[in-house]
């Protein structure tokens, strides 16, 4: 048996699976969990791979740590999405963080992640019970939350792809709200889809961000389970250089995939993409 996620133009990513462990429907989406033959458990939302438990760090590390290490003192962090718990887990690796708020619209994704995925080390359960001192969970719409809340050093958007229901998270209006929610200096990051298969969406998001943020960067990273390389977009408020990270803090993290040595390589986009991203 296989699980196949089909991308545009007939491109697919497939996993051999032993069994389907869970299938359900929340108010927002279809949720599935599979046991794969070689990559642990697979979480899919509306047929789209969110993670495989053996390799998920390749996504969560590359989303979180570059921006956290580029900020001189990331004390207050907002995570929008990330119901599987991987992003908030990585945020809390940074001892500078005093408060992290995670806003997830679909509570059932969190419940499934707690029961069947377990990559968060018990963090989600503690957050659901209000027992985590440094992290707070809010069940709600991140688009609405960011309209009424501000004072964040870092904003991380861990959403589904920049097509369909998540499209609002890649709009100029949302970027304006995010910019206002950031302290100065502040830094914003979002995943932006497959470099090769969602190039047009990547360019559109980059252009929208460039109209709002003081500086915008695009980078990519090979992610297990996705149509890699996977793109990420960073928006800067104030005077920060995303290419420069705190090396001492980085060395303390001892991560599996991302480290200071490969930080420079994440900016190496294919030539045609670089040409499309030029001002």
From Swiss-Prot:
The protein's assembly and partners: Homodimer or homotetramer.
PANTHER family per the UniProt record, alphabetical: SPERMIDINE SYNTHASE, SPERMIDINE/SPERMINE SYNTHASE
SUPFAM superfamilies: S-adenosyl-L-methionine-dependent methyltransferases
Record field: catalytic activity: S-adenosyl 3-(methylsulfanyl)propylamine + putrescine = S-methyl-5'-thioadenosine + spermidine + H(+)
Protein name: Polyamine aminopropyltransferase
Record family assignment: Belongs to the spermidine/spermine synthase family.
Function: Catalyzes the irreversible transfer of a propylamine group from the amino donor S-adenosylmethioninamine (decarboxy-AdoMet) to putrescine (1,4-diaminobutane) to yield spermidine.
């Amino acid at each position: 048996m296989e699980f196949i996620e089909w991308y545009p133009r007939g491109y697919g990513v497939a996993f051999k699976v032993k069994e389907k462990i869970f299938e359900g429907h929340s108010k927002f989406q279809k949720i599935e969990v599979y046991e794969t033959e070689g990559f642990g458990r697979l979480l899919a939302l509306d047929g789209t791979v969110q993670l495989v438990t053996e390799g998920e760090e390749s996504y969560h590390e590359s989303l979180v740590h570059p921006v956290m290490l580029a900020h001189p003192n990331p004390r207050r962090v907002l995570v929008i999405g990330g119901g599987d718990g991987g992003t908030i887990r990585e945020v809390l690796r940074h001892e500078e963080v005093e408060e992290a708020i995670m806003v997830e619209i679909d509570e059932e994704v969190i419940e499934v992640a707690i029961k069947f995925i377990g990559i968060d080390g018990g963090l989600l359960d503690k957050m659901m019970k209000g027992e985590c001192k440094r992290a707070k969970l809010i069940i709600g719409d991140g688009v609405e939350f960011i309209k009424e809340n501000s004072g964040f050093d870092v904003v991380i958007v861990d959403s589904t792809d920049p097509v369909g229901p998540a499209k609002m998270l890649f709009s100029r209006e949302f970027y304006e709200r995010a910019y206002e929610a950031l302290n100065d200096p502040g830094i914003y990051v979002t995943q932006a889809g497959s470099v090769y298969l969602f190039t047009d969406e990547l360019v559109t998001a980059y252009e929208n961000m460039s109209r709002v943020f003081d500086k915008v960067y695009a980078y990519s990273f090979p992610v297990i389970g996705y149509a890699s390389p996977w793109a990420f977009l960073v928006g800067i408020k104030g005077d920060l250089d995303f290419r420069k990270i705190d090396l001492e803090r980085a060395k303390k993290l001892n991560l599996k995939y991302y480290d200071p040595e490969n930080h420079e390589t994440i900016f190496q986009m294919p030539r045609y993409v670089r040409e499309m991203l030029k001002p």
